[in-house]
């Protein structure tokens, strides 16, 4: 079988999005290819997720560039997913004889890859690529985990009344955006259930809210996340892979951005009317209650 080497990391600094979507791609391809995942310092959660999909190799962080290159024989397909893989690093992989796929949210470098996947952009003119590079752009190329692909096939009925809310701002959420929006949601008089999905590294900036309607959950499987989103009347999240997963489940989504690489995707979501816009959630200026109420009124006018 043809070999595919997947290269992606996760951490409190870069989040888990790169790792999750690349592993989702490995899961899609594992029956037809010999897949191996390469990553630095995996957490117990990452290990448990990789073990469900394919073999994995742990790289040493201080030498991961050279260590991964030395593992290549030249007959592999390589999938890279992170912002720090430069054009020169892409070229080094290509010079080995490998076929190269880059998964990226940005378009800030020249690509020598054979394929570039970017679900957050639809304009090919934004990309600096080789003549042979194939661009796979837009939602049709979103790398969703299996439970979300299955949820997308089912017809969902969106409720006008917001009673169940899920809040998810990544595994680390160092800015405690979760805490801010939990407090916002508690002001919605119709809400009777709030689930805040957090990671092991999450540390609230103030004492956690004590409210019978609120529960914190962590280490959710893909199936548990899909079930939660399908059961929620509103999902509040960042303009990231989580947002795509929530939309795939048919949920009403309120989303914002807090790092630069999310801004263009956020603008795409807004321009298509797919989300309730929350703007820059590190400097929140949108009142959630007003935004939800306004969207509800607009929906009934059209």
Predicted regions and their residues:
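Extreme N-terminal starter segment of soluble prokaryotic enzymes
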Residues: 1-5
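Active-site and donor-binding regions of nucleotide-sugar-utilizing enzymes
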Residues: 7-16, 21-28, 39-131, 135
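Short internal beta-strands
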Residues: 35-41, 195-199
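A nucleotide-sugar donor-handling region in carbohydrate enzymes
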Residues: 113-176
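Donor-nucleotide binding loops and adjacent catalytic segments primarily
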Residues: 153, 159-231
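Acidic donor-binding loop of glycosyltransferase active sites
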Residues: 230-241
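Catalytic binding pocket for nucleotide-activated donors in carbohydrate/polymer assembly enzymes
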Residues: 243-285
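Conserved small/polar residues in nucleotide/adenosyl-binding loops
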Residues: 295-302
């Amino acid at each position: 079988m043809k070999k595919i080497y997947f290269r992606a990391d996760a951490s409190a600094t870069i989040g888990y999005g790169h790792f999750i979507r690349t592993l989702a791609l490995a899961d899609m391809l594992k029956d037809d290819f010999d897949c191996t995942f390469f990553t630095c310092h995996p957490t117990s959660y990452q290990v448990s997720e990789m073990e469900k999909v394919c073999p994995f190799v742990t790289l040493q962080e201080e030498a991961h560039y050279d260590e991964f290159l030395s593992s290549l024989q030249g007959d592999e397909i390589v999938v890279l997913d992170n912002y720090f893989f430069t054009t020169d690093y892409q070229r080094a992989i290509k010079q080995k004889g490998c076929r190269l796929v880059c998964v990226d949210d940005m378009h800030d470098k020249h690509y020598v890859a054979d394929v570039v996947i970017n679900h957050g952009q639809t304009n090919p003119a934004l990309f600096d690529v080789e003549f042979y590079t194939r661009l796979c752009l837009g939602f049709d190329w979103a790398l969703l985990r299996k439970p979300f692909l299955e949820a997308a096939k089912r017809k969902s009925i969106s409720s006008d009344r917001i009673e169940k809310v899920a809040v998810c701002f990544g595994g680390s959420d160092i800015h405690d955006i979760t805490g801010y929006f939990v407090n916002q949601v508690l002001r919605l008089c119709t809400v009777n259930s709030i689930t805040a999905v957090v990671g092991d590294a999450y540390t609230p900036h103030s004492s956690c809210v004590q409210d019978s309607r609120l529960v914190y959950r962590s280490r959710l499987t893909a199936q548990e996340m899909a079930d939660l989103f399908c059961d929620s009347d509103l999902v509040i999240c960042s303009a990231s892979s989580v947002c795509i997963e929530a939309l795939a489940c048919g949920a009403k989504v309120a989303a914002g951005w807090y790092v630069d690489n999310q801004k263009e995707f956020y603008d795409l979501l807004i321009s298509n009317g797919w989300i309730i816009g929350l703007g820059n959630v590190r400097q929140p200026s949108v009142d959630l209650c007003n935004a939800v109420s306004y969207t509800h009124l607009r929906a009934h006018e059209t």
